Amino acid sequence: MASTSDFKNGLVLQIEGQLWTIIEFQHVKPGKGPAFVRTKLKNVLSGKVVDKTFNAGVKVETATVDRRDMTYLYHDGSDYIFMDGDTYDQVSISESTVGDQSRFLLENMAVQVATHEDVPLFVELPVTVELVVKHTDPGLQGDRSTGGTKPATLETGAEINVPLFINTGDKLKVDSRDGNYLGRVNS
C-alpha cells in the first residue's frame, strides 16, 4: 500500500485488478476544499492512458514489478526468446507483450523485461539504439518538398524517416520509444 504522497513516475499501482503505471502526477491544493492528486495512468497490458484523480492521503494498492536485465536471442514463430544474464534461463515472450518494441529489436541486444508474479508485462529497450540502414533511395539535392526527409528501411525491417543525406549502409542512432532519427553514428 502506498499513500498519494508516495507517488512517483513509474510506480505501478493495482487498481480494480489491473496494473497501471504512473506517467505523471501533480499534487493540487486548491484555495478552497481538500487537496488532491491528479494523475495520468497507463495500463501496463493494454497501453491505454487515462486521467484519474485521488484525494490526498488515500492509500492505493501497489504492485511489485521486477525488472530483469535480459538479452534478446531470437524470434521463434509468434514468440521472442530472451535469456536472463544471471541464471541463463531462456524466457519465451509473446509478440503481443513485446509490442512495437520489436521494430528495433536486434539479436544479442540487452533489454529490460518487467514481470509481475513471473508473468512478463512488457519489454523495455534502451532509449537509443544503433541500427544500419538496409535500403533508402538516394537523396536528390534541392528536393525539399517533403521537408527534407525520406523513408529508410533499417536492418530490423522498421521504416523511419531520415534526412536526405543518409545513404544505404549508414549506421544511425534511433529513439526506440518513438522511432525518430537522432543522428549518424561515427564508426
Swiss-Prot record:
Q: Which GO terms describe its cellular component?
A: cytoplasm
From the UniProt record, give the pathway where this protein acts. Protein biosynthesis; polypeptide chain elongation
One Pfam family hit:
EFP_N
Q: Which PROSITE patterns match?
A: EFP
Q: Which PANTHER family match?
A: ELONGATION FACTOR P, ELONGATION FACTOR P (EF-P) FAMILY PROTEIN
Question: Would you indicate the residue range of the signal peptide?
Answer: none
UniProt keyword list = Cytoplasm, Elongation factor, Protein biosynthesis
> Of which family is this protein a member?
Belongs to the elongation factor P family.
Q: Does the keyword Cytoplasm apply?
A: yes
Q: Superkingdom, according to UniProt?
A: Bacteria
Any one biological process term the GO annotation gives: peptide biosynthetic process
Classify the main location. cytoplasm
Free-text function comment from the UniProt entry: Involved in peptide bond synthesis. Stimulates efficient translation and peptide-bond synthesis on native or reconstituted 70S ribosomes in vitro. Probably functions indirectly by altering the affinity of the ribosome for aminoacyl-tRNA, thus increasing their reactivity as acceptors for peptidyl transferase.
Native organism is Rhodococcus erythropolis (strain PR4 / NBRC 100887)
Query: Subcellular location, in the record's words?
Result: Cytoplasm
Q: Which SUPFAM superfamilies match?
A: Nucleic acid-binding proteins (SSF50249), Translation proteins SH3-like domain (SSF50104)
**Name the record gives this protein:** Elongation factor P
Q: Which InterPro entries match?
A: Elong-fact-P_C, NA-bd_OB-fold, Rib_uL2_dom2, Transl_elong_fac_P/YeiP, Transl_elong_KOW-like, Transl_elong_P/YeiP_cen, Transl_elong_P/YeiP_CS, Transl_elongation_fac_P
Molecular-function GO terms, alphabetical: translation elongation factor activity
